[in-house]
Amino acid sequence: MKSEKVLVLRTCANNMTDHCGLVWPILGLVECKFWEPTIKLENGLTGALWGQGSSAQLSMNADAKWVVCEVTMGDLIFLENNEGVKFPRAEVVHVGTRSSALGYISDNVSKHEACSSNLIEKFTFSDVKSETRNISPALPVTVDNMPNGVNRSTTVRNTQTLETAVYGSTLTGANQSQLIAGYGSTETAGDSSTLIAGYGSTGTSGSDSSIIAGYGSTGTAGSDSSLIAGYGSTQTAGGDSSLTAGYGSTQTAQVGSNLTAGYGSTGTAGPDSSLIAGYGSTQTAGGESSLTAGYGSTQTAQVGSDLTAGYGSTGTAGSDSSLIAGYGSTQTAGGDSSLTAGYGSTQTAQVGSNLTAGYGSTGTAGPDSSLIAGYGSTQTAGGESSLTAGYGSTQTAQVGSDLTAGYGSTGTAGSDSSLIAGYGSTQTAGGESSLTAGYGSTQTAQVGSDLTAGYGSTGTAGSDSSLIAGYGSTQTAGGDSSLTAGYGSTQTAQVGSDLTAGYGSTGTAGSDSSLIAGYGSTQTAGGDSSLTAGYGSTQTAQVGSDLTAGYGSTGTAGSDSSLIAGYGSTQTAGGDSSLTAGYGSTQTAQMGSNLTAGYGSTGTAGSDSSLIAGYGSTQTAGGDSSLTAGYGSTQTAGHGSILTAGYGSTQTAQEGSSLTAGYGSTSTAGPESSLIAGYGSTQTAGHESTLTAGYGSTQTAQEDSSLTAGYGSTSTAGFNSSLIAGYGSTQTSGYESILTAGYGSTQTAQDNSSLTTGYGSTSTAGYQSSLIAGYGSTQTAGYESTLTAGYGSCQTAQEQSWLTTGYGSTSTAGYESRLIAGYGSTQTAGYKSILTAGYGSTQTAQEESSLTAGYGSTSTAGYASSLIAGYGSTQTAGYDSILTAGYGSTLTALDSSTLTAGYGSTETAGFGSSLMAGYGSSQIAGYGSTLTAGYGSTQMAERDSTLTAGYGSTGTAGQDSSLIAGYGSSLTSGMRSYLTAGYGSTLISGLQSVLTAGYGSSLTSGIRSSLTAGYGSNQIASHKSSLIAGHESTQIAGHKSMLIAGKGSSQTAGSRSTLIAGANSVQMAGDRSRLTAGANSIQTAGDRSKLLAGSNSYLTAGDRSKLTAGDDCVLMAGDRSKLTAGKNCVLTAGADSRLIGSLGSTLSGGENSTLIFRCWDGKRYTNVVVKTGTDEVEADVPYQIDEDSNVLIKAEDNSDTPVDQSQIQP
């Protein structure tokens, strides 16, 4: 009886594990390793006998596996409290759903009926009782024909209440409730409620509620609520709420809320809220809120907010806010805010803000702000701000600002500012500013400024400034300034200035200045100045000056000056001066002077002078003088005098006099006199005199004199004199003199003199002199002199001199001199000199000199010199020199020199030199040189040289040279040279050379050379050469050469050569050559040759040759030859030859030839031998052999004629 079997029902998890972690098999034996024969639940396998009794071992999860197992009756132990049965081992006979498991038991119970006595009861409903008690409800098996059994379980029901539980459960249900729970669970339900939970769960609900949860979950719901959750979840809901969550989730909701979330999520909602989230998300919402998020997201919202976000996003919102964002985004908003962003974006906003941005953007806004931006943008705004920008832009604004910009722009604004800009622009503004600019512009403004500019413009303004400019303009203004300019203009102003100019103009003003000018004008003003000029005019003024001029005029004024002039006029005034002139006039005044003249007049005045003259007049006056003259007058005044003269006048004054004269006047003054004269005047003054003259004047003064002259003047001064002259002047001064001259002037000074000249001047100075000259000047200085000259100047200095010149100048310096020159200059320096020159210059230096030159320059240096030059320059250096040059330059150096040049340069170096050049350069080097060149270069070197060149270059080297070249290059070398080239190159070398080339190259070498080439290359070599080539190459070699080629190559060799080729190659060799080739090759050789080829080959040789080939080949040879081939071959030979072929081959021999057919009989090879001229075998007739070893004549129509077999040798 104890060995009989019974059926036990239980459930496992979806992965076939029970609550203790034991994995049950699908079918077969299962055993408990920790079995103890007690009535406790632990240490054993458990279940419901015949599926009846307590349901403690049964799970209500939808994915649970229902297991039916067979247990030996003797192993059964009935557990306490009617909790089922316990057993140490069992055999699983069925795994499926609840329905299939119960069906299996019903179908198989009759098989165990003999052993079922007193173990089975028929399931019946008990009478309904009113009390509630802790019970273990039974799980029924609804079959009517099951045998009677012992009473091992009891079923009890409350009034209109259905309760189903297992051991350790507590169920309390009100009227019309249904409670189902696993073991160890606690459920409490109000009226008309339904609670279903797994083991270890806790469920509490009000009336009309529904709770469904997995094992270990906790559900608490008010009335009219619905809770659904996976195992291990916690749900708490007020009335009229609906909560749905996956396993391990936590949901808390007040009255009227709807929460839906994936597993592992956390949801907290106030009344009347709706939360939807993916697994692992966290949602917290106040009342009347709606939150929707993807998995792994976090959302926090106050009352009345609406949040929508993709997976992995974070949203935080105050009350009545709306947030919409893509996956991975972060949004933080105060109340009454609306945020919309693409994936991966970050948005932060205070109360009442509206933010919209593309993916990957960052937005930060204060209260009541509006931000709109494209993807990848960054926006930061204070309260009550509005920002709009294209993708990739950056905008930063304080409270109350409005910013609008195109893509890729940058905007920074203070409070209450307005910025509008095109794409790629940069705007920075202080508070209460307004900036408007086209694309690519840059604007910077302080508080309260207004800037408007076209595209590509630059505007910088202080506080309370207004800037308006066309495209491409540049404006810089201090506070309280107003600037207006056309396109391409430049305006710079300090605080409180007002500038207005046409297009292409330049305006520079100090504080509180006003500038008005036409297009193309230039204005420069100090503070508190007012400048007005027509188009193309130039005005320069210091603080507090007022200048007014017509178009094309030039005005220069000191501080607190007033200048008024017609169009085309020129005015120059010191401080506190007033100048008034008609159109085309020229006025020059020192400080405190007052000049008034008609049109076309010229006025020159010292300080605190007053000059009045008619139109076309010339006035020259010293300090504290007053001159008045008509046009064409001449004025001469003594010391402290005041002279006034008209056109062409002559003025003469003694010491302390002040002279003023018109054009063409002559002035003579004593010592301490001040002379001022017009154009073409002549002035002579005594000791300590001050002379001022116009254009073309002549001035002569003794010691301590100060001379000032106009254009073309001549000045002569004594000791310690100071001379200033205009263009084309001539000045001669004694010791320690200071000379200043205009363009084309000539200055001569002795020791310790300082000379300054204009363009085209000539200066000569003694010892320790300092010379400065303009363009085209000529300067000559003694020892330790410093010379500075403009363009086209000529400077000559002795030892330890410092020379600086402009473009096109000529400099000559002595020992240890340093020379600097502009473009196109010519410099010649002595020993240890340093020369620097601009473009197109010519420099010549001796030993140990350092030369630096610009583009197109010519440099020549002595021993151990270092030369650096620009593009297209020519450099020549002595021994051990280092030369560096730009593109297209020409470098020539002697022995042991290092040369570096740019593209297209030409280099020539002596012995042991190293040359490096750019593309297309030409290099020539002496013995033992190293050459490196770019693409398409030409290199020539003597013996023991190393050449490296780029693509398409040409290299020629002497004996024992090494050449490396790029693609398509041409290399020519002497004997014992090593050549390496790229694809398609041409190599020519002398005897005993090694040549290596890329694909498609052509190689030609002398005797005893080794040639290696890539695919498709051509090689030609003299006697005793070794050739190696890639696929499809062509090789031609002299006598006694060895050729190796790849497949499909063509080889031609002289007598006694050895040829080795790949398949499909063509070989031609002279007499007594040895040819070896792969399959599909063609071999042609002269007499006494040896040919070896693979299958599908074609071999042709002269007399006394030996031909060996594979199957399917054609062999042709002259007399006295030996031909051996495989199957299906055609062998043809001359007289006295020996032909060997296998089955399927055709043999044709000349007179007295032997034909041998190799036959296979299944065990061994046998030979069928015939001879021409005997046995009815004719010469020059093709013969074959059939499968029966019969020799047949191969007819032209492919028909076979048998030969007398009796005559055939076995």
From Swiss-Prot:
SUPFAM superfamilies assigned to the protein according to its UniProt record, in alphabetical order: Phage fibre proteins
Any single Pfam family the record assigns to this protein: Ice_nucleation
Protein name in UniProt: Ice nucleation protein
Molecular function terms, GO-annotated: ice binding
Residue segments, region Octapeptide periodicity: 165-1156
GO cellular component, one term: cell outer membrane
Functional description taken from the UniProt entry: Ice nucleation proteins enable bacteria to nucleate crystallization in supercooled water.
Domain of life assignment: Bacteria
Membrane topology term: Peripheral membrane protein
Record's subcellular location: Cell outer membrane
Gene source species: Pseudomonas fluorescens
